[in-house]
Amino acid sequence: VAAYATAVEVNGGHPDTYVVRKGDTLWDIAGKFLQKPWLWPEIWQANPQIANPHLIYPGDVLSLAYLDRVTAKPGPRQEAPVTGVPLAQVEPFLKQLSVVDSIEGLPYVVGLEDNRLRATGGQTAYVRLADAQPGQRWAVVRPTVRYAQPKPTEDLTANGDVTPGSGNLWKAFNAPNHRRGVLGYELAQVGLGTITQVAGEKTEASTLVLDSNANGREVRAGDRLVPVEAQPYDLQFFPHVPAASVEGVDVRVLAVTDMFDAGGPRDVIAISAGKAQGVDNGTVFSLWRQGSHVAHRMKYPTSSRMDDSRSTGAGRVTLPDEYAAHAMVFRTFDNVSYALVMQGVKPVKVGYSALHPDAK
């Protein structure tokens, strides 16, 4: 069983007080006081005398008080609370994408107005939808990536099951096969619509009128439907270490968003663990390239002659794991989560391991 030190290491140059500014994130704030931002819950002392004591707002004055505890003196609190990660850098992954365990049984588009091949805002889609009601709001989505657990110790290339041009935001992701179980199906939103007429005796399809679509995507037959969520995400969370239930789970990077096949700070990644494994928003992982197993090719010479040293091909050597970065989860699904790379020393690639943030 792995054990990690939990002693809180306060930054030597930390401020005695800090006035929270608009644009700060909880990771930024924690880093001003701590060498390890994921230990913020260890020093944060919520004020029980104020509403929503765990939220921090621009204008609040944070102080490192007695026994290395951070307390907050509320400011005017006229703006939105500070978020865990910058909204602008993760917004497409909050509003456009979701992951489901299966796409079987989802309602779907069977046809379009005037027998079109594509439909956009203001036009009509005909959908197979049980128990449809006029006025219901639905998101039209398209399956893009099918996630599966990567092979161990493998740097994977940008292959995978994807519908080209369908809203997939990843530049590299793991390609599943029949030997590795599917973790989930990613759905990209292509439009929104409202049910105006339901199926009846003379028709088997309900009518969905599409909203004006600012993203320019077009709906087509075969697209699926999911309910519109009133609040699909929450960005008010603290960085923290993984729950005990995550220990021992083989968590790996499934996808990266950088322009090539690797991601650096402020790039989004997908990892192979979610709510079912105890991962929640704010969970921090360290990301590692597993040490390669290389052939031990050199034979030590039995004499001083250099040409006696030859490649033997015998034996293999395991190289050390290599640290790449830290990432913080900002959205979770059953078996997949999205995380933002917060800091690192080298690019993150698909297949890298996600470990406890204090792993060495």
Listing of model-derived features with the role each one plays in the protein:
Residues 1-360:
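Surface-exposed, polar/charged interaction patches used for macromolecular assembly or partner binding
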